[in-house]
Amino acid sequence: MRVAVDGARLFVDFAGAKLRPDGPWLREVPTVVLVHTGPGTDHTAYKETIGPAVAEDAQMVYVDLRGHGRSDPSTPDTWRVGTWADDLRVLLERLGIERPAVIGGGFGALTVLRFAQRWPDALSKLVLVNPVARNGVPRVVARFEELGGAPAGEAAHAFHEHPDEHTLTQYMHQCLPVMLGPHYVVPAMLTPIWNLPLTIEWVREEASSLDLRDELARISAETLIVAGTDDPQYPVASIEEVVEGIPHASVRWYQGARHAVYRDAPESIRMVKDFVTR
């Protein structure tokens, strides 16, 4: 379904009923909202990993952010983390969803962090997967070079400093295998609906200046951080800034896990499921 929010329609999909038979009664289960990674991709990868597991005991709500996937493209000036956070707030109001658990991974964690900073009481629990509060290009480049060699480091530097179609192509060729593992690159490119102009626009216009560190302490929801040690786009040092900035956040590190933590460390799925449904 599509829900209108401030000049755009957001694509939303559901898995699992909110009310479930429990003997002669109906039992209400938690609602969990998932915000995808990116920029420029959609929610579909999660329907093969965390989504089905969580939907066993909760109502799962998948959202494509404005400009992403099956949501309206909107206009480039709206492709900003603040707008996506505002959209999420309006979407929950339109759907009548009160204080859900919210999951955000990688790029999606930026939107979820901003949402949780602006409306601390609007969510019950927060799950962040490989979250960072700022881009930190030197760290990103250094980690790509460490894990993927000089070609990966050079491609990461070129795209973040001079984002365009050419440098994005080189980034995808050299860097995605390091981020995801070589076997996952083709599915990652073919399965989602990509908006590559958005990818370029966001990196060029907002990525270098965005910094959410100062307001991390505003987040009051119970928070679980799930982190892989080998995601070069979201380095350990940058993730640790989020861990240290959110009061009472707990963190679980998965050694050797890359960007797709759920695939590299399947045991993380159970941890997230137990956290959001308990």
Predicted regions and their residues:
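Catalytic histidine-centered segment of alpha/beta-hydrolase-like enzymes
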Residues: 257-269
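Short beta-strand/loop motif that positions the catalytic acidic residue
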Residues: 219, 225-227
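Active-site loop/oxyanion-hole signature of alpha/beta-hydrolase fold enzymes
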Residues: 61-107, 270
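Conserved HGGG/HGGXW glycine-rich cap/lid loop of the alpha/beta-hydrolase fold
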Residues: 8-73
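Conserved alpha/beta-hydrolase "acid-adjacent" motif
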Residues: 232-238
